[in-house]
């Protein structure tokens, strides 16, 4: 496929896996870069230095609210442990990333989280939306965000990002609705003379990522139930080379961009498409409209 591999290793807490360091040794031997998406609780100076030596580029932590909210979502003391881990990670020469999952629960706290990560010299900050696992969770007042509320949040955060553009923190515009927001502000323009059949940006499902579970099952996206094959496993499960999975019929389902109910009618189809995983959580369909997209088409 002529692709450059990059692994994101997550859990739970991947450090607790009995063969965690063996896996990293294999990646190091193959000169494959990787990121750990984990917890702060088992990080020490020695652990962070060992990660750096084995080729870890980045360690991602989660901050899902200010102290009270974050600890209620995670566990008591987690907020302070996370802040303490930032210095450990950066002190070992690793990049420290902070990821926030946005929902109705913490929507109003996100701007202050931005202030917090800048104060602590976090290298990379990004956020993504909560993917509900049931209809009840999708429409709950604790989790649901109205499209107008979400656009207002992006507007508030863009002003914060502009204020902090000379800080140590890079703000990753992870949510593809940023493209719509910047398009409306005139900061993103659709380039001329593009191939009409090429996807240039937006959701990377079936484009440049897959998820491999500990069982060997492969998902098109880690944020919703999307099985497309198995690399290994027991019993009667058929195992398939990764190339064949990525280019197989199950994966091709997620390349049918013309089937997207709302996005297919939008001029930003090849650049945005919102988050189909969030749409799946609401409607049990990858092709349903993004529930936080405010654009009328």
Indicate residue ranges for each PLM-predicted region.
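Radical SAM enzyme [4Fe-4S]-AdoMet core and its adjacent flexible, acidic
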Residues: 52-53, 58, 62, 69-215, ...
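Short, surface-exposed acidic/glycine-rich loop or hinge patches that mediate macromolecular interfaces
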Residues: 14, 41, 64, 103-104
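Structural motif corresponding to alpha-helix initiation and N-cap regions
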Residues: 17, 21, 44-45, 107-111, ...
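Accessory C-terminal segments flanking Radical SAM cores
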Residues: 177-297
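Conserved alpha-helical substructure of the radical SAM core
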Residues: 1-57
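Flexible loop residues that form catalytic
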Residues: 12, 64, 130, 271, ...
């Amino acid at each position: 496929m002529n692709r450059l591999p990059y692994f994101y290793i997550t859990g739970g807490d991947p450090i607790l896996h009995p063969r965690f360091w063996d896996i990293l040794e294999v990646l190091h031997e193959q000169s494959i870069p990787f990121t750990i998406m984990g917890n702060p609780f088992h990080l020490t100076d020695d652990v962070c230095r060992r990660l750096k030596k084995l080729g870890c580029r980045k360690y991602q932590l989660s901050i899902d609210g200010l102290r009270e909210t974050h600890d209620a979502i995670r566990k008591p003391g987690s907020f302070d442990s996370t802040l303490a881990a930032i210095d450990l990670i950066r002190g070992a020469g690793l990049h420290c990333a902070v990821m926030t999952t946005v929902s109705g629960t913490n929507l109003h706290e996100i701007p202050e989280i931005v202030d917090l990560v800048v104060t602590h010299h976090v290298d990379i900050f990004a956020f993504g939306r909560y993917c509900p696992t049931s209809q009840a969770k999708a429409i709950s007042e604790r989790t649901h965000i109205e499209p107008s509320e979400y656009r207002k949040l992006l507007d508030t955060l863009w002003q914060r990002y502009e204020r902090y553009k000379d800080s140590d923190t890079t703000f990753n515009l992870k949510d593809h609705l940023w493209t719509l927001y910047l398009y409306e502000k005139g900061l993103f323009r659709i380039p001329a003379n593009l191939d009409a059949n090429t996807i240039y940006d937006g959701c990377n499902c079936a484009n440049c990522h897959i998820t491999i579970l500990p069982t060997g099952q492969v998902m098109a996206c880690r944020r919703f139930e999307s099985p497309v094959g198995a690399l290994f496993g027991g019993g009667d499960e058929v195992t398939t080379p990764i190339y064949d999975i990525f280019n197989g019929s199950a994966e091709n389902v997620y390349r049918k961009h013309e089937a997207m109910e709302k996005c297919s009618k939008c001029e930003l189809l090849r650049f945005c498409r919102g988050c189909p995983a969030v749409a799946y959580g609401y409607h049990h369909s990858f092709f349903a409209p993004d529930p936080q997209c405010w654009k009328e088409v």
